[in-house]
Amino acid sequence: MDHAADRHRTDLMTITRFVLNEQTKHPESRGDFSILLSHIVLGCKFVCTAVNKAGLAKLLGLAGETNVQGEDQKKLDVLSNEVFIKALVSSNRTCILVSEEDEEATFVRPANRGKYCVVFDPLDGSSNIDCGVSIGTIFGIYMIKDGHEPTLDDVLQPGMNMLAAGYCMYGSSCTLVLSTGSGVNGFTLDPSLGEFILTHPDIKIPKKGKIYSVNEGNAKNWDSPTSKYVQSCKYPADGSSPKSLRYIGSMVADVHRTLLYGGIFLYPGDKKSPNGKLRVLYEVFPMSFLMEQAGGQAFTGKQRALDLVPEKIHERSPIFLGSYDDVEEIKKLYAAEEQN
């Protein structure tokens, strides 16, 4: 490749250009959604820089506070949360923000208010910060139900009502994966340009994968269908090769690998945590939305994940998501359990 020539290319598909192209498909659009996405992208760039400098800037370690989930807050968590709140409010396109780090939803003051609700986890996998494992930001976007004064009901909607969802992974490269409801596309940050470039157009998850991803440390507390499924991954009844176990412990990294290579990601409910650990609004819904848009499935153990109607902003749910055929297998095990 001629890197010197590549440096001067201006025909690259940047995320801004991509979003504007999508906007032209909706003649009635006023550009509000594009402006909101540009502010989310800016927040991701800012957090990416902070993550890269974290060790040098002494941002690692605890901030001495705990968040609503009872988890110790990292300094980077606090910073990332502030970055996204400010970026979203300053877009003048949002009315309600729900963050994993804040106990209450943030209602934007009327002067800065728009028609979108954004749910987000500013820094998922933050327990991995100190050891350099990939971490990320997860987000989902809803529109308020109508022109009334915004209430919590505007965010307590089923995942299938989401307009867009995505995540930004801060790892060996900074990758932003986005769906606006018509497929999934991946963008990689070019540090020399400061731009996200389309590198993974129209991502489709393989129909069946060779990898399963689950925390087996919880195995003694699993229900029967989960135990049977993991057993079948290790010892297939048909004598075929077993699936490989890959588990990082950072949802963004585990789901990203599942999306690209196929397979299944599981965070089941168990005796200790019947509702699982992952939060519905800003973890389960965005990742399930992306999986379905890429041709996969997402299941809670009882129903399609995107059909869930949350009652609280920090509600949790079990989740099984990934390749269509792999999720279909665990759905059959739960169906058989129900019949017994």
From Swiss-Prot:
It holds the Pfam family FBPase_C. It catalyses: beta-D-fructose 1,6-bisphosphate + H2O = beta-D-fructose 6-phosphate + phosphate. Keywords: Carbohydrate metabolism, Cytoplasm, Hydrolase, Magnesium, Metal-binding. GO terms for biological process: fructose 1,6-bisphosphate metabolic process; fructose 6-phosphate metabolic process; fructose metabolic process; gluconeogenesis. Substrate binds at D124, G125, S126, S127, N215, Y247, Y267, K277. Binds 3 Mg(2+) ions per subunit. Mg(2+) 3 binds at D121, D124, E283. InterPro entries: FBPase_C_dom, FBPase_class-1, FBPase_N, FBPtase, Fructose_bisphosphatase_AS. GO terms for molecular function: fructose 1,6-bisphosphate 1-phosphatase activity; metal ion binding. Its cofactor is Mg(2+). One of its GO terms (cellular component) is cytoplasm. Its main location: cytoplasm. Its EC number is 3.1.3.11. It is an enzyme of class 3 (hydrolase). Mg(2+) 1 binds at E71, E100. Mg(2+) 2 binds at E100, D121, L123. CDD domains: FBPase. NCBIfam families: PRK09293.1-1, PRK09293.1-3. Belongs to the FBPase class 1 family. In plants there are two FBPase isozymes: one in the cytosol and the other in the chloroplast. This is Fructose-1,6-bisphosphatase, cytosolic. It comes from Solanum tuberosum. The lineage of its organism: Eukaryota, Viridiplantae, Streptophyta, Embryophyta, Tracheophyta.
